[in-house]
Amino acid sequence: MPVLIPPVEHSQDTRVGHPAWREATRALAEEAHQLTDRCGQEAVTMWQPNESVRDPHVAHHLCRAAYILPWRFRVEMLKGGSTMEKPPPGEGVTLWKSKMKPPAWHARLPLPMHRDARALQTAEVVQAHARGARLTAARLGRAQHQINGQLRLLQRQREATDRRLSEVRKALLINQQSVKLRGYRPKSETISDKADSMLTWEKEELKSMKRKMEADMEKSEALLKTLASCRDALVFCCKERLQAVELMNQPLDKVLEQAGRHSWVNISRVPTPRTQGLKTPPPDPVGTYTPECAKALYEAKRLLMESKDTLLDMAKNEEDIREQQQQISDRVCASLAQKMRETLELKDRLNMTLGLMRGTIHRCTKFNQEMYITRGLIKGPLSKSHLETREKLDRPLVRMYQRHVGTQLPEAARLAQGTDKLQRHISHVEKNLDELLSMRKKLTWSFNCKKIGHNVDYSVVRLRLRQRHPQVCYEQAQRLVNDWDPRTPPRVKSNTAITK
């Protein structure tokens, strides 16, 4: 009698892992999610008002929807029955495309211009403290201030020009390293091309830029020394004039305003024919406006005009050279990239030719082997005892046929002729196979040369793009040119040298 087995109850949960294991992973993920939200919220709250911090017990999308609701445009009814959307009132940036106007955020941390603001406040305090001299001292101080500002501008421009000169020198080193790297190509790839001409042209242009910027540096250095000597003369004359008015509580700017002369406030301004306000007194050796002061002010005005023209020329040259250097570098990189594409195209063509030749060589080799087998089959066995009956020349059928004169069978002669013809064909196939192998060797060598040339050009482009980055200084590029050699292994110190 059959026995009925009760059906096995299958659980609804088909997962294999233990629930505690899943709960631990879920708890860890939830903890990481909460930590991410908390850290992100704390980082954002440093740049947002207090009311922007969301409630941790409310969903993120609900908090965001409630927070940005006042930002949205409001629909207003017009008299004609039409509607018009207007942004909400108050400060903020109006986003017309998204129809929102977020309010202005207030930073709780010092802004990046905090240092400049404090420096400006300090300068204002110092300038306010320095206002306490008479008219001549005020004019000398004003001239000294403008000369100092011009000195700072000239110094900054010299720094910018020096940085650009360093970039030009670094570009020369990069050019030298590029030529050096391209020298490691195989002999078949070292034929002079447009990329070499571009590198030579780049070198000449960079040398011309270098000479031009060195001339600007020499000119600005001489002007800087002249401005410094003029500033020292103004400082000496100003201190000498201030000796008699140290106790007079009257600002220098106020004195210049009361004088009513714009050319005294700004010494680079050309004076008008109709003078309004106070007039410049004649130089008096025993008066307030001495010939030394007049000479210092005249020299300061002349140098200020000259330095402005020099600054404009230097800034224009620096900008032009920067753009020209960038264009030249891009053109050289473009020519190298074009050479890489051409090399890659030729390399692919050689690779396809090698593949086709490889198949032909395999077929010729197989055919040659089959011809050897065919020749062996045609020649037959080495021993007579191994011949088949139908191949023997003394078999009864042949002897009966050869009883009459002139009835010789041409079987042996034709076998010899076929064997000789097959041997000549085998020799011809072997000759062709040798030519194919020789040509494959040449193609492989040319393919490897193209590959090396492509890798060298790629390394040159990569080196140029990496070395022309502003963070790479001139010394690093110089060490790269002087110390690194791709074909020279690193120096290994011997034990004797270490002991010494």
From Swiss-Prot:
Signal sequence coordinates: none
Q: Which residues form a coiled coil?
A: 198-229, 420-444
Any single GO BP term: flagellated sperm motility
Q: Tell me which domain of life the UniProt entry assigns to the organism this sequence originates from.
A: Eukaryota
- GO CC list: axonemal B tubule inner sheath; sperm flagellum
**What task does this protein carry out?**
Microtubule inner protein (MIP) part of the dynein-decorated doublet microtubules (DMTs) in sperm flagellar axoneme, which is required for motile flagellum beating. Forms an extensive interaction network cross-linking the lumen of axonemal doublet microtubules.
Traced from the root, the source organism's taxonomic lineage reads: Eukaryota, Metazoa, Chordata, Craniata, Vertebrata
Q: How does it assemble?
A: Microtubule inner protein component of sperm flagellar doublet microtubules.
Q: Which UniProt keywords apply?
A: Cell projection, Cilium, Coiled coil, Cytoplasm, Cytoskeleton, Flagellum, Phosphoprotein
Give residue numbers for the modification (Phosphotyrosine): 372
Q: Does the keyword Cell division apply?
A: no
Q: Tell me one Pfam family matched here.
A: Tektin
**Where is the major localization of this protein?**
cytoplasm
Q: Where in the cell is it found?
A: Cytoplasm, Cytoskeleton, Flagellum axoneme
Q: What is this protein called?
A: Tektin-like protein 1
